[in-house]
Amino acid sequence: MSPTLQLACDLISRASVTPEDAGCQALMTERLRAIGFHIESLRFDDVDNFWAVRGASGPILCFAGHTDVVPEGDPAKWQSPPYEPTITDGLLYGRGAADMKGSLAAMVTACEAFVAEHPNHTGRIAFLITSDEEGIAANGTVKVVEWLEARGEKVTWCLVGEPSSTQSVGDVIKNGRRGSLGCKLTVKGKQGHVAYPHLAKNPIHLVAPALADLAAEQWDEGNDFFPATSFQVSNFNAGTGATNVIPGEAAIVFNFRFSTESTADELKQRTEAILAKHGLDYDIHWHLSGEPFLTPAGALVDAAVTAIRAECGAEPELSTSGGTSDGRFIAPTGAQVLELGPVNATIHQINECVNVADLDKLSATYQRILKELLA
């Protein structure tokens, strides 16, 4: 069993359901301390984080990731217990195998191999690890970034170990992500009897034309790196459960996934202008989960592409598709950010798994990126 596979198994065996760490970070920091990293453990509320650095000065290449996992669901539906790492037909099964304990193991073993070859490397290597990525993400990476900024430390390049690949490891690199802007809209009407609509105001009827306009709106056209901004309603709640009562209010939850062609403020203003056009009486609450970011061609992209060609035999696609990641907290500091990890086909699913051979490929790829930037 390779060092990367062994460490991945050790991490999977710890049931670190968000925001629990369950001892995963202790495993990692023990290994990193042994090769000269200075470790700073950072606990914010119920969340464990750590920042580890090797090297005294110069640009920082940071490995970022999370030890927490999503709940396993019904264990009886798994082909093997979700926290007992099991290898079957070349696949490693277990919760977190792909998202993202396999990546964490590859990061650590890549650094061990790199430091053994280059004990006096240039620049600095860092780890920013949290147990609060799969949950509300309020006391994890975002807090560590604030802590780093307060003491004037800036990450130059950042590799986030999210499972970016689709068919084979290294076939896709995420070099950006769309922004995410959520909203809860409560439209007020007047409750009444369905037989006497003239004595009531039906908020469903009132808001329906506005929602149709919002859904039909062309928010932007996207660009070479991002698709057009999308608007999606995820929840619509109204009514008392009775069939003869017009509801007094309707609550709608919707989300924008937006490109760099739009800003959160612009989307808010345009949304509220459409609502105003329809004369609605409403309350509105916005939540910005993250701004869009893009890492263009440069040192980090070049290093990653070179490494993937050499270690995976793939020609990677640069993509900004998919959901958000903790890269959204790191990119605004000015860092170049990429997401590079294993195949994402089974993440958050029953029988989550990762190809065993891909773990060593990923470790070798991370090691090659270290060589390209810091050797």
Swiss-Prot record:
Keywords: Amino-acid biosynthesis, Cobalt, Diaminopimelate biosynthesis, Hydrolase, Lysine biosynthesis, Metal-binding, Zinc
Catalytic activities: N-succinyl-(2S,6S)-2,6-diaminopimelate + H2O = (2S,6S)-2,6-diaminopimelate + succinate
Record protein name field: Succinyl-diaminopimelate desuccinylase
The family this protein is said to belong to: Belongs to the peptidase M20A family. DapE subfamily.
Cofactor note: Binds 2 Zn(2+) or Co(2+) ions per subunit.
InterPro entries, per the entry: Bact_exopeptidase_dim_dom (IPR036264), DapE_proteobac (IPR005941), Peptidase_M20 (IPR002933), Peptidase_M20_dimer (IPR011650), Peptidase_M20A (IPR050072)
One of the record's GO molecular function terms: succinyl-diaminopimelate desuccinylase activity
Active site per the UniProt annotation: 68, 133
Record-linked PANTHER family: ACETYLORNITHINE DEACETYLASE (PTHR43808), N-ACETYL-L-CITRULLINE DEACETYLASE (PTHR43808:SF31)
Pathway: Amino-acid biosynthesis; L-lysine biosynthesis via DAP pathway; LL-2,6-diaminopimelate from (S)-tetrahydrodipicolinate (succinylase route): step 3/3
Cofactor entry: Zn(2+); Co(2+)
Top enzyme class: hydrolase
Residues that bind Zn(2+) 1: 66, 99, 162
Function noted in UniProt: Catalyzes the hydrolysis of N-succinyl-L,L-diaminopimelic acid (SDAP), forming succinate and LL-2,6-diaminopimelate (DAP), an intermediate involved in the bacterial biosynthesis of lysine and meso-diaminopimelic acid, an essential component of bacterial cell walls.
Quaternary data: Homodimer.
Residue positions binding Zn(2+) 2: 99, 134, 348
Source organism superkingdom: Bacteria
Enzyme Commission number, as recorded: 3.5.1.18
BP GO terms, sorted: diaminopimelate biosynthetic process; L-arginine biosynthetic process; lysine biosynthetic process via diaminopimelate
Matches recorded under HAMAP family: DapE (MF_01690)
Lineage: Bacteria, Pseudomonadati, Pseudomonadota, Gammaproteobacteria, Cellvibrionales
